Protein backbone atom coordinates (compact mmCIF):
# COMPACT_ATOMS: atom_id res chain seq x y z
CA UNK A 1 0.00 0.00 0.00
CA UNK A 2 1.42 3.39 -0.96
CA UNK A 3 2.45 5.60 1.92
CA UNK A 4 0.92 8.62 0.19
CA UNK A 5 -2.51 7.17 -0.52
CA UNK A 6 -5.25 8.41 1.83
CA UNK A 7 -7.34 5.60 3.30
CA UNK A 8 -10.76 5.74 4.86
CA UNK A 9 -12.88 3.06 6.55
CA UNK A 10 -16.33 3.06 5.04
CA UNK A 11 -19.47 1.02 4.89
CA UNK A 12 -19.64 0.32 1.19
CA UNK A 13 -22.31 1.72 -1.06
CA UNK A 14 -21.67 4.87 -3.11
CA UNK A 15 -24.88 5.58 -4.93
CA UNK A 16 -25.94 9.23 -4.75
CA UNK A 17 -25.44 12.49 -2.85
CA UNK A 18 -26.40 12.50 0.80
CA UNK A 19 -30.17 12.53 1.30
CA UNK A 20 -31.79 12.66 4.71
CA UNK A 21 -34.70 10.21 5.00
CA UNK A 22 -37.59 11.02 7.27
CA UNK A 23 -37.61 7.66 9.02
CA UNK A 24 -34.95 5.41 10.50
CA UNK A 25 -34.45 1.69 10.18
CA UNK A 26 -32.25 -1.05 11.57
CA UNK A 27 -28.99 -0.99 9.63
CA UNK A 28 -28.09 -4.42 8.21
CA UNK A 29 -24.90 -6.15 9.39
CA UNK A 30 -22.08 -6.91 7.00
CA UNK A 31 -22.58 -10.45 5.68
CA UNK A 32 -20.09 -11.75 3.13
CA UNK A 33 -17.51 -11.22 0.38
CA UNK A 34 -17.98 -13.03 -2.95
CA UNK A 35 -14.95 -14.29 -4.91
CA UNK A 36 -15.00 -15.56 -8.50
CA UNK A 37 -12.91 -18.70 -9.03
CA UNK A 38 -12.70 -21.37 -11.78
CA UNK A 39 -13.27 -24.29 -9.38
CA UNK A 40 -14.88 -23.91 -5.99
CA UNK A 41 -13.58 -26.84 -3.98
CA UNK A 42 -9.93 -26.06 -4.79
CA UNK A 43 -10.37 -22.39 -3.89
CA UNK A 44 -12.12 -23.22 -0.61
CA UNK A 45 -9.35 -25.65 0.33
CA UNK A 46 -6.65 -23.10 -0.59
CA UNK A 47 -8.16 -20.48 1.72
CA UNK A 48 -8.70 -22.94 4.56
CA UNK A 49 -5.05 -24.02 4.33
CA UNK A 50 -3.39 -20.65 3.80
CA UNK A 51 -5.73 -18.07 5.35
CA UNK A 52 -7.90 -19.86 7.92
CA UNK A 53 -11.59 -19.97 8.74
CA UNK A 54 -13.94 -22.92 9.14
CA UNK A 55 -16.87 -24.61 7.42
CA UNK A 56 -19.45 -22.11 6.22
CA UNK A 57 -23.18 -22.21 5.55
CA UNK A 58 -22.64 -24.49 2.53
CA UNK A 59 -19.63 -26.24 1.01
CA UNK A 60 -18.93 -23.31 -1.32
CA UNK A 61 -18.02 -20.91 1.48
CA UNK A 62 -15.82 -20.35 4.52
CA UNK A 63 -17.04 -18.82 7.79
CA UNK A 64 -15.03 -16.72 10.20
CA UNK A 65 -16.89 -17.52 13.40
CA UNK A 66 -19.20 -20.29 14.57
CA UNK A 67 -22.17 -21.13 12.33
CA UNK A 68 -25.25 -21.30 14.58
CA UNK A 69 -28.08 -21.04 12.04
CA UNK A 70 -29.40 -17.87 13.68
CA UNK A 71 -28.54 -14.17 13.77
CA UNK A 72 -25.96 -12.85 14.01
CA UNK A 73 -24.45 -15.03 11.28
CA UNK A 74 -20.66 -15.25 10.99
CA UNK A 75 -18.86 -13.34 8.27
CA UNK A 76 -18.31 -15.54 5.22
CA UNK A 77 -16.17 -15.75 2.09
CA UNK A 78 -18.33 -17.20 -0.69
CA UNK A 79 -16.85 -18.74 -3.84
CA UNK A 80 -18.65 -18.63 -7.19
CA UNK A 81 -17.86 -20.23 -10.55
CA UNK A 82 -16.32 -18.08 -13.28
CA UNK A 83 -14.05 -19.07 -16.14
CA UNK A 84 -13.05 -15.56 -17.23
CA UNK A 85 -12.71 -13.43 -14.09
CA UNK A 86 -10.05 -10.71 -14.06
CA UNK A 87 -7.71 -9.77 -11.17
CA UNK A 88 -9.20 -7.60 -8.43
CA UNK A 89 -6.28 -5.15 -8.08
CA UNK A 90 -7.27 -1.67 -9.20
CA UNK A 91 -11.00 -2.40 -9.28
CA UNK A 92 -13.74 -0.90 -7.14
CA UNK A 93 -13.21 -3.79 -4.68
CA UNK A 94 -9.44 -3.93 -4.79
CA UNK A 95 -8.60 -6.40 -2.03
CA UNK A 96 -9.77 -8.35 1.00
CA UNK A 97 -7.91 -8.18 4.31
CA UNK A 98 -7.13 -10.79 6.96
CA UNK A 99 -5.43 -10.28 10.32
CA UNK A 100 -2.77 -12.43 12.01
CA UNK A 101 -0.84 -12.38 15.29
CA UNK A 102 2.63 -12.38 13.72
CA UNK A 103 2.74 -10.95 10.20
CA UNK A 104 6.38 -11.79 9.49
CA UNK A 105 5.83 -15.43 10.45
CA UNK A 106 2.65 -15.61 8.35
CA UNK A 107 4.32 -14.14 5.28
CA UNK A 108 7.21 -16.61 5.60
CA UNK A 109 4.72 -19.47 5.94
CA UNK A 110 2.91 -18.35 2.79
CA UNK A 111 6.15 -17.92 0.86
CA UNK A 112 7.25 -21.42 1.88
CA UNK A 113 3.92 -22.72 0.55
CA UNK A 114 4.43 -20.99 -2.79
CA UNK A 115 1.92 -18.18 -2.28
CA UNK A 116 2.66 -15.05 -4.31
CA UNK A 117 3.65 -12.13 -2.05
CA UNK A 118 3.31 -8.89 -4.00
CA UNK A 119 4.40 -6.49 -1.24
CA UNK A 120 6.55 -7.43 1.79
CA UNK A 121 5.65 -6.50 5.38
CA UNK A 122 5.89 -2.76 6.06
CA UNK A 123 4.54 -0.16 8.45
CA UNK A 124 3.78 3.48 7.71
CA UNK A 125 2.88 5.95 10.45
CA UNK A 126 0.11 4.76 12.75
CA UNK A 127 -1.17 2.16 10.29
CA UNK A 128 -1.08 -1.57 10.96
CA UNK A 129 1.95 -3.51 9.84
CA UNK A 130 0.76 -5.01 6.57
CA UNK A 131 1.72 -6.89 3.41
CA UNK A 132 -0.02 -7.89 0.18
CA UNK A 133 -0.40 -11.29 -1.46
CA UNK A 134 -2.39 -12.69 -4.37
CA UNK A 135 -4.33 -15.93 -4.54
CA UNK A 136 -3.97 -18.20 -7.61
CA UNK A 137 -7.11 -16.71 -9.20
CA UNK A 138 -6.35 -12.99 -8.98
CA UNK A 139 -7.79 -11.87 -5.65
CA UNK A 140 -5.53 -9.31 -4.01
CA UNK A 141 -5.14 -10.06 -0.29
CA UNK A 142 -3.98 -7.62 2.38
CA UNK A 143 -2.40 -9.25 5.42
CA UNK A 144 -2.33 -7.14 8.59
CA UNK A 145 -0.92 -7.66 12.06
CA UNK A 146 -3.77 -7.01 14.47
CA UNK A 147 -3.65 -9.59 17.30
CA UNK A 148 -6.80 -8.19 18.91
CA UNK A 149 -8.98 -8.80 15.84
CA UNK A 150 -7.95 -11.97 14.01
CA UNK A 151 -9.43 -13.49 10.86
CA UNK A 152 -11.51 -11.78 8.18
CA UNK A 153 -10.71 -8.14 8.86
CA UNK A 154 -11.68 -5.75 6.07
CA UNK A 155 -12.12 -5.02 2.38
CA UNK A 156 -10.37 -2.24 0.45
CA UNK A 157 -12.43 -0.20 -2.00
CA UNK A 158 -11.25 2.19 -4.70
CA UNK A 159 -13.84 4.97 -4.98
CA UNK A 160 -14.08 8.50 -6.33
CA UNK A 161 -14.67 10.60 -3.21
CA UNK A 162 -14.73 8.70 0.12
CA UNK A 163 -14.88 11.83 2.28
CA UNK A 164 -17.92 13.30 0.57
CA UNK A 165 -19.94 10.12 0.94
CA UNK A 166 -19.01 8.86 4.42
CA UNK A 167 -22.17 10.30 5.95
CA UNK A 168 -24.25 8.57 3.27
CA UNK A 169 -22.67 5.22 4.10
CA UNK A 170 -23.35 5.66 7.80
CA UNK A 171 -26.98 6.40 6.99
CA UNK A 172 -27.34 3.36 4.71
CA UNK A 173 -25.44 0.76 6.73
CA UNK A 174 -24.79 2.11 10.20
CA UNK A 175 -21.47 1.57 11.93
CA UNK A 176 -19.31 3.83 14.07
CA UNK A 177 -17.17 6.69 12.82
CA UNK A 178 -13.68 6.29 14.25
CA UNK A 179 -9.99 6.85 13.67
CA UNK A 180 -8.50 3.37 13.37
CA UNK A 181 -4.70 3.21 13.30
CA UNK A 182 -4.58 6.32 11.13
CA UNK A 183 -7.45 5.25 8.89
CA UNK A 184 -10.50 7.47 9.25
CA UNK A 185 -14.00 6.13 8.74
CA UNK A 186 -16.46 3.54 10.03
CA UNK A 187 -16.24 0.27 11.90
CA UNK A 188 -18.80 -2.49 12.39
CA UNK A 189 -19.27 -4.29 15.71
CA UNK A 190 -22.03 -6.79 14.84
CA UNK A 191 -19.63 -9.74 14.56
CA UNK A 192 -16.57 -8.51 16.41
CA UNK A 193 -14.81 -5.76 14.51
CA UNK A 194 -14.95 -5.51 10.73
CA UNK A 195 -13.87 -2.65 8.51
CA UNK A 196 -14.26 -1.54 4.91
CA UNK A 197 -11.44 0.72 3.76
CA UNK A 198 -11.38 2.90 0.67
CA UNK A 199 -8.86 5.04 -1.19
CA UNK A 200 -9.57 7.68 -3.80
CA UNK A 201 -9.41 6.35 -7.35
CA UNK A 202 -11.19 7.94 -10.31
CA UNK A 203 -10.17 5.16 -12.70
CA UNK A 204 -11.12 1.95 -10.85
CA UNK A 205 -12.93 -0.65 -12.95
CA UNK A 206 -16.33 -1.97 -11.78
CA UNK A 207 -16.00 -4.98 -9.49
CA UNK A 208 -18.49 -7.25 -11.26
CA UNK A 209 -16.77 -10.02 -13.20
CA UNK A 210 -13.47 -9.57 -11.37
CA UNK A 211 -11.94 -11.86 -8.76
CA UNK A 212 -13.74 -9.98 -5.97
CA UNK A 213 -17.17 -9.69 -7.52
CA UNK A 214 -19.23 -8.13 -4.73
CA UNK A 215 -19.80 -7.53 -1.04
CA UNK A 216 -22.99 -8.25 0.89
CA UNK A 217 -25.04 -7.04 3.83
CA UNK A 218 -27.63 -9.20 5.61
CA UNK A 219 -30.78 -7.25 6.55
CA UNK A 220 -33.26 -8.84 8.95
CA UNK A 221 -36.12 -7.34 6.90
CA UNK A 222 -35.11 -7.13 3.23
CA UNK A 223 -38.27 -5.34 2.10
CA UNK A 224 -37.87 -2.62 4.70
CA UNK A 225 -34.21 -2.11 3.84
CA UNK A 226 -34.93 -1.96 0.11
CA UNK A 227 -37.72 0.57 0.61
CA UNK A 228 -35.51 2.70 2.84
CA UNK A 229 -32.66 2.69 0.33
CA UNK A 230 -35.08 3.71 -2.41
CA UNK A 231 -35.72 6.92 -0.45
CA UNK A 232 -32.00 7.63 -0.92
CA UNK A 233 -32.30 7.25 -4.68
CA UNK A 234 -30.76 3.78 -4.89
CA UNK A 235 -31.32 1.98 -8.20
CA UNK A 236 -31.38 -1.81 -7.95
CA UNK A 237 -30.11 -4.16 -10.67
CA UNK A 238 -32.42 -7.08 -9.82
CA UNK A 239 -35.99 -7.76 -8.73
CA UNK A 240 -36.53 -5.96 -5.41
CA UNK A 241 -39.16 -8.47 -4.28
CA UNK A 242 -37.45 -11.82 -4.93
CA UNK A 243 -38.72 -15.27 -4.08
CA UNK A 244 -36.72 -17.31 -1.59
CA UNK A 245 -33.79 -19.13 -3.15
CA UNK A 246 -33.82 -22.89 -2.58
CA UNK A 247 -31.47 -24.11 0.11
CA UNK A 248 -29.40 -25.97 -2.51
CA UNK A 249 -27.06 -24.65 -5.18
CA UNK A 250 -24.81 -26.03 -7.92
CA UNK A 251 -21.04 -25.55 -7.92
CA UNK A 252 -18.50 -26.74 -10.44
CA UNK A 253 -16.27 -29.74 -10.00
CA UNK A 254 -12.54 -29.89 -10.67
CA UNK A 255 -10.77 -31.35 -13.67
CA UNK A 256 -10.31 -34.63 -11.83
CA UNK A 257 -14.11 -34.85 -11.73
CA UNK A 258 -14.50 -34.12 -15.42
CA UNK A 259 -15.83 -30.65 -14.70
CA UNK A 260 -19.11 -32.04 -13.41
CA UNK A 261 -21.31 -29.68 -11.44
CA UNK A 262 -22.35 -30.86 -7.99
CA UNK A 263 -25.36 -29.93 -5.90
CA UNK A 264 -24.56 -28.56 -2.44
CA UNK A 265 -27.52 -28.42 -0.06
CA UNK A 266 -27.76 -26.74 3.31
CA UNK A 267 -27.93 -28.70 6.52
CA UNK A 268 -31.14 -28.62 8.64
CA UNK A 269 -29.89 -25.63 10.67
CA UNK A 270 -29.01 -23.64 7.55
CA UNK A 271 -31.19 -21.17 5.78
CA UNK A 272 -32.84 -20.26 2.47
CA UNK A 273 -32.30 -16.71 1.26
CA UNK A 274 -33.87 -13.76 -0.52
CA UNK A 275 -31.36 -11.68 -2.46
CA UNK A 276 -31.31 -8.37 -4.36
CA UNK A 277 -28.41 -6.69 -6.16
CA UNK A 278 -27.31 -3.16 -6.90
CA UNK A 279 -24.20 -1.54 -8.37
CA UNK A 280 -22.94 1.74 -6.98
CA UNK A 281 -21.87 4.69 -9.11
CA UNK A 282 -18.28 3.79 -8.21
CA UNK A 283 -18.77 0.31 -9.63
CA UNK A 284 -19.04 -1.59 -6.34
CA UNK A 285 -21.48 -4.47 -6.77
CA UNK A 286 -23.55 -4.94 -3.60
CA UNK A 287 -25.77 -7.80 -2.50
CA UNK A 288 -28.48 -7.63 0.14
CA UNK A 289 -29.28 -11.11 1.46
CA UNK A 290 -32.03 -11.98 3.91
CA UNK A 291 -31.61 -15.29 5.75
CA UNK A 292 -35.30 -16.07 6.04
CA UNK A 293 -35.54 -18.54 8.90
CA UNK A 294 -33.08 -16.59 11.01
CA UNK A 295 -35.28 -13.57 10.40
CA UNK A 296 -38.27 -15.39 11.88
CA UNK A 297 -40.15 -16.00 8.61
Describe the residue ranges of each PLM region.
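Bacterial N-terminal signal peptides
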Residues: 5-17
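Vicinal oxygen chelate
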Residues: 22-25, 28-38, 58, 63-66, 85-157, 179-189, ...
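Core segments of cupin and vicinal oxygen chelate
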Residues: 25-27, 31-76, 105, 122-132, ...
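Amphipathic N-proximal alpha-helical interface segments
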Residues: 76-84, 141-145, 198-202
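Short, P/G- and charge-enriched loop/turn segments at secondary-structure junctions
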Residues: 83-85, 202-204, 262-266
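Long, low-complexity, intrinsically disordered C-terminal regions of large eukaryotic nuclear proteins involved
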Residues: 169, 201, 243-247
Amino acid sequence: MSSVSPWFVIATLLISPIVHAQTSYEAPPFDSIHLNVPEISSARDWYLKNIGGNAGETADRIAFGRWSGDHPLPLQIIFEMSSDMKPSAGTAIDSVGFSFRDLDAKVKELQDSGVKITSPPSKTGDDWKHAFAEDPWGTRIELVENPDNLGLHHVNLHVKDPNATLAWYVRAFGGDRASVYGREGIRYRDLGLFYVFASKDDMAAPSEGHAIDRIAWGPIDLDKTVNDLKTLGVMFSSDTNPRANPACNFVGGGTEEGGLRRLFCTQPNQLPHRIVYLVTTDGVKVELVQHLEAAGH
